[in-house]
Amino acid sequence: MNRKYKSLWPVIMFVVLSGLQLIGLPAFAQGPGPGQRIPLPPIPIKGDTTHTLSKHFTPASAATKTPDAKGFIQRWLVLEPVKKEIDRNNIFTDNYLRTTFSNDNFSGDYTTVPKNGETVKVGNQELKWYALDSKAFNFNLYHFTYALNKPKYGILVWLVTVINCPEEIQNVRIAAGCNSGSMWWLNGQEALLLSGDRDMIADNGTSARLTLKKGKNIIRGAVINGPGMANFCVRFLDEKGTPVKNLSISYE
């Protein structure tokens, strides 16, 4: 008999403990007692709902603009985004970018400089140019599209700026970073292609050696992104990797 009871003892303990847990559940399910405050859900942080360009940009003026302390170019003509159906960023191969930038182009003349406020047509989309100075070293296209209440994801954005050099500067390189893919031209010639799903890292890619001619030099850029925050930064580096700053920037 003792052996029989000993073999049943674990079963009896399991039943007793299970019963105690069931009895205690209602107590745990009850609300706070008298004098206790009902916990409130966390208050979400209020986002930026202003949709204004002035938060991150200033309108470009006729005043002389030079690169920032680290040589980054902050003045750009920026076209409203071309809406694209892009579900993922790993499709940005060299061939994809070249084909897309060729098909969804506002002009086949890569030395043309649009006018501030001008509207152009890309496919069936009518889009406007804005001449802006970024308040940061980079130009955040998410902030730009958000401010205009335009699509923020699945976009292609065209860019143009004019670099004025007091003298010819040889053996410089375009250094750019972008999210996610981009292509850059100097005076009508392809200079740099950044393919793949990239994060915006300064100097993430550099061109071959280039020459900035005396006078006007035209940079054109195209940045494309699917999910995530579109963004870019550009500067010139000399042979020693030092930022080139003896130039000025305009939008005409």
Language-model region placement:
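Short beta-strands within extracellular/lumenal beta-sheet-rich domains
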Residues: Y153-N164
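Accessory carbohydrate-binding/adhesion or oligomerization-edge regions at the termini
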Residues: Q30-F139, A222-E252
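Signal peptide processing junction and immediate N-terminal pro/mature segment
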Residues: I23-G31
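Non-cytosolic beta-sheet module surface loops
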Residues: C165, I174-C178, V223-N225
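N-terminal secretory signal peptides that target proteins for export/translocation
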Residues: M1-V11
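Aromatic-lined ligand-binding clefts that engage carbohydrates, nucleic acids, or primary amines
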Residues: Q170-W185, I219
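Beta-strand-rich ligand-recognition modules
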Residues: L186-V234
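Bacterial N-terminal signal peptides
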Residues: P10-G24
